[in-house]
């Protein structure tokens, strides 16, 4: 949270130096300034994750990718199939005598909430550079529809995950990592929540401060991505692809 506040102060200082004279958020911070800040903050951590994934792939004996393996892995990840457990009744990490799909559904909300937010940014980028359609966008535009729905799923999902972790047995995982996991979930939820608040109050006098806080949280999330549980999604997908390869190899061998 200290990093969020720190980055928010940086954005506030940038705004104080001078605005771009644009509309909406761009009246606070120009589009070019946002790109200059966030492009490297997003791409450099991804490069770090990619290098690490390459090493992981070599370590597990990964083979050249095939479309069938990718489709199998993405389908399995999209359904959160492994969180249903082998018997399909869900997890019992809260109570050994009671199985539940709650953890699976919460993961669904977080994952699809994040993907919708990412889709919102991606669509807005295409509209800006490909079609000359610049922000601000109306509520019924794809960037807003994806962003608002994704923000709601992300906020609700992260809040539910924190409550679920409070009830879970910490000894079933690494106790030393529990605090870091909670911190990451709270940060991710704060990104969604601050975005929703910014949208709701974007036409008021508090918009510049809310924009600084939201951008600060997003920048913090990007920079910490390789060092938080966010990275496990990449490794999990790679492991699912490798598992699909092994199953295909076994079926061919039979």
Regions found by a protein language model. Give the residues of each.
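Membrane-embedded alpha-helical bundles of multi-pass integral membrane proteins
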Residues: 1-254
């Amino acid at each position: 949270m200290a990093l969020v506040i720190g980055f928010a102060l940086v954005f506030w200082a940038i705004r104080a130096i001078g605005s771009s004279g644009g509309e909406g958020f761009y009246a606070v911070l120009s589009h070019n300034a946002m790109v200059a800040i966030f492009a490297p903050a997003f791409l450099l951590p991804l490069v770090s994750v990619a290098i690490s994934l390459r090493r992981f792939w070599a370590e597990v004996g990964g083979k050249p990718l095939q479309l069938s393996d990718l489709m199998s892995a993405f389908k399995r990840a999209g359904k959160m199939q492994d969180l249903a457990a082998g018997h399909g009744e869900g997890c019992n990490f809260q109570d050994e005598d009671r199985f539940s799909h709650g953890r699976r559904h919460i993961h669904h909300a977080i994952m699809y909430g994040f993907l919708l937010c990412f889709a919102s940014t991606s669509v807005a980028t295409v509209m800006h550079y490909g079609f000359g359609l610049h922000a601000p966008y109306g509520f019924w535009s794809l960037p807003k529809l994806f962003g608002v729905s994704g923000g709601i799923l992300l906020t609700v999902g992260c809040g539910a995950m924190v409550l679920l972790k409070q009830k879970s047995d910490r000894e079933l995982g690494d106790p030393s990592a529990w605090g870091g996991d909670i911190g990451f979930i709270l940060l991710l939820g704060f990104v969604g929540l601050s975005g929703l608040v910014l949208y709701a109050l974007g036409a008021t006098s508090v918009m510049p401060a809310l924009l600084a806080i939201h951008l600060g949280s997003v920048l913090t999330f990007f920079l910490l991505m390789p060092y938080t549980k966010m990275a496990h999604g990449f490794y999990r997908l790679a492991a699912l692809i490798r598992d699909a390869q092994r199953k295909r190899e076994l079926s061919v061998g039979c």
